[in-house]
Amino acid sequence: MEDRLHMDNGLVPQKIVSVHLQDSTLKEVKDQVSNKQAQILEPKPEPSLEIKPEQDGMEHVGRDDPKALGEEPKQRRGSASGSEPAGDSDRGGGPVEHYHLHLSSCHECLELENSTIESVKFASAENIPDLPYDYSSSLESVADETSPEREGRRVNLTGKAPNILLYVGSDSQEALGRFHEVRSVLADCVDIDSYILYHLLEDSALRDPWTDNCLLLVIATRESIPEDLYQKFMAYLSQGGKVLGLSSSFTFGGFQVTSKGALHKTVQNLVFSKADQSEVKLSVLSSGCRYQEGPVRLSPGRLQGHLENEDKDRMIVHVPFGTRGGEAVLCQVHLELPPSSNIVQTPEDFNLLKSSNFRRYEVLREILTTLGLSCDMKQVPALTPLYLLSAAEEIRDPLMQWLGKHVDSEGEIKSGQLSLRFVSSYVSEVEITPSCIPVVTNMEAFSSEHFNLEIYRQNLQTKQLGKVILFAEVTPTTMRLLDGLMFQTPQEMGLIVIAARQTEGKGRGGNVWLSPVGCALSTLLISIPLRSQLGQRIPFVQHLMSVAVVEAVRSIPEYQDINLRVKWPNDIYYSDLMKIGGVLVNSTLMGETFYILIGCGFNVTNSNPTICINDLITEYNKQHKAELKPLRADYLIARVVTVLEKLIKEFQDKGPNSVLPLYYRYWVHSGQQVHLGSAEGPKVSIVGLDDSGFLQVHQEGGEVVTVHPDGNSFDMLRNLILPKRR
């Protein structure tokens, strides 16, 4: 064993002595490590010079001698080469020196280095060929400052630790804010269970041996990069490193960063060429700079991006470097900034950027994939039990009595595809499957960060609807959970299913409904007599639910100008620009009663990859210097159900004309001209809804045509009414 280990001076130990580590000490250190969240390597770097964004402020900051910088390092780790990472060079020694030993696969040594080992250094993976690589020994100061949880991390094929290092310039509040912005967008693109994102400060970048344990270096600062740090970054590239530059002064390979005042903080149209030569067009926020080729050129890589303007300004370049696979993708558009950034000044710019937000993520993922990272969809979360909750205390006892009479001998209520097993408590050993889900009846055991029962109770002002709640953190789809209950439960119990996430959400025509955390997801059970105003006009149900969502937000005092709209037949929109939610209705006629499941989902807090209600509130506050508070999903679901019950009552009492004025106030189609069937189809003008809830359009010849929502869809981008794909 001794001859497989090396110490700092290159010697091998004569003897290995086992040391007993006390469990109490180990647990204390692990607890301290796990409680840290910020991935900061060093506290205070040296300040750097900042490059001004004026016309000449970034002229010719490219390095025009890549040959001198791109040479392969000739000396191995431990040499005194100036191109080697700082901290890896030979250290001077006196007559008495202490050299420290570390086995690469030893977690205890890493996590106890402060209390047990004076200074742990890396054991070379090359010198321990048949021991497993352990990336937990990535930086000597990690255990001192912060150390992420290491369980379940995926080892990548490069043999390097899965570290993504973010360099954002000098140590300042502005830089810290930039770090959080960049970290947030990268965490949305890659699997954070497979990669660790660190804040790389200047002192640490110069001193620590990070280059051997870095999969990707992200440089996101407009400040000039000190020469010694620049050389460090180039040495990393020459060793096969990968670099992503985000609106940064960093460049090489004959490319120069030059400023162009007309582009500064403006929204431009970008044409991005992917590795397969396909193109993506999107609106982007320009940094005010562009890339120009200098006298020395390198062959460009597979990715390119230019503005759709007369000069076709180069904004994204892909530059290979060296002979060991080093490469960089450098950008002068703000892919790291959300549309809600303070840099975005006007509502028009916000709309353009939000409309391209999904494509912004598409471009980022393409870049990260090209640089060797995995941007696969995150693992589907495990299903969780349902909790049976009640919004009114007086309904709890009758509910439990009803359940006692209707469950079978195994405590289950079964439908064709699903069994609900009612239990007083849940233990994690019980398997949860899409076909068998436990329902916990003990309300005292319930707690969730995504659903506050008290907030829901306070804002639910109904006589029947939404009184009994089935809540799940993660469930396949809320639409199936009431199959075995919808024909049996008394009307006064008002069943609703609410979920924080769905793994198999459904939309119209079998479309998949993406349901991340931050959506308000619910399925509500209502019953409508066949021989009633609404029973004779069932298509109106989806319209009532859509308008209930909009009214639930816009009827809040001071929120009346939040630009939520309804789009025929079943969507909730931001203005006429972007979908923010939708409604799905399934109805079954049994005897003289329609039993209707209304599925509804709309984005409340999840800004990415598209848009959410709180984005609209943030933008409204910015434009009007207001201080409207962000909203919660549980709060809004309660308000939606309350508004819906009121609309149903008005409809039943007075017919469709009692609710149509509210519907028309919020819908996006008034006077709109569209084509039926295809772009070559007949041109018509939208009139409104007929007495049955179907869309009426006026043809040029004078004929009024009715379009049924079941089987047709409205394409807002092309002004078409098309058959719904199935």
From Swiss-Prot:
PANTHER family: BIOTIN PROTEIN LIGASE, BIOTIN--PROTEIN LIGASE. Widely expressed. Mostly expressed in muscle, placenta and to a lower extent in the brain, kidney, pancreas, liver and lung. One of its GO terms (biological process) is response to biotin. It catalyses: apo-[methylmalonyl-CoA:pyruvate carboxytransferase] + biotin + ATP = holo-[methylmalonyl-CoA:pyruvate carboxytransferase] + AMP + diphosphate + H(+); apo-[propionyl-CoA:carbon-dioxide ligase (ADP-forming)] + biotin + ATP = holo-[propionyl-CoA:carbon-dioxide ligase (ADP-forming)] + AMP + diphosphate + H(+); apo-[3-methylcrotonoyl-CoA:carbon-dioxide ligase (ADP-forming)] + biotin + ATP = holo-[3-methylcrotonoyl-CoA:carbon-dioxide ligase (ADP-forming)] + AMP + diphosphate + H(+); biotin + L-lysyl-[protein] + ATP = N(6)-biotinyl-L-lysyl-[protein] + AMP + diphosphate + H(+). Residues 463-652 form the BPL/LPL catalytic domain. Changing residue 581 to S: In HLCS deficiency; <10% activity. Disulfide bonds: none annotated. GO terms for molecular function: ATP binding; biotin binding; biotin--[biotin carboxyl-carrier protein] ligase activity; enzyme binding; identical protein binding. Keywords: ATP-binding, Cytoplasm, Disease variant, Ligase, Mitochondrion, Multifunctional enzyme, Nucleotide-binding, Phosphoprotein. It comes from the Eukaryota. Changing residue 547 to G: In HLCS deficiency; 3.4% activity. It is an enzyme of class 6 (ligase). GO terms for cellular component: chromatin; cytoplasm; cytosol; mitochondrion; nuclear lamina; nuclear matrix. It comes from Homo sapiens. Residues 28-98 are annotated as: Disordered. Changing residue 363 to D: In HLCS deficiency; has normal or low KM values for biotin (non-KM mutant). It is found in: Cytoplasm; Mitochondrion. Changing residue 518 to E: In HLCS deficiency. This is Biotin--protein ligase. Residues 43-75 have a biased composition (Basic and acidic residues). InterPro entries: aa-tRNA-synth_II/BPL/LPL (IPR045864), Biotin_CoA_COase_ligase (IPR004408), BPL_C (IPR003142), BPL_LPL_catalytic (IPR004143).
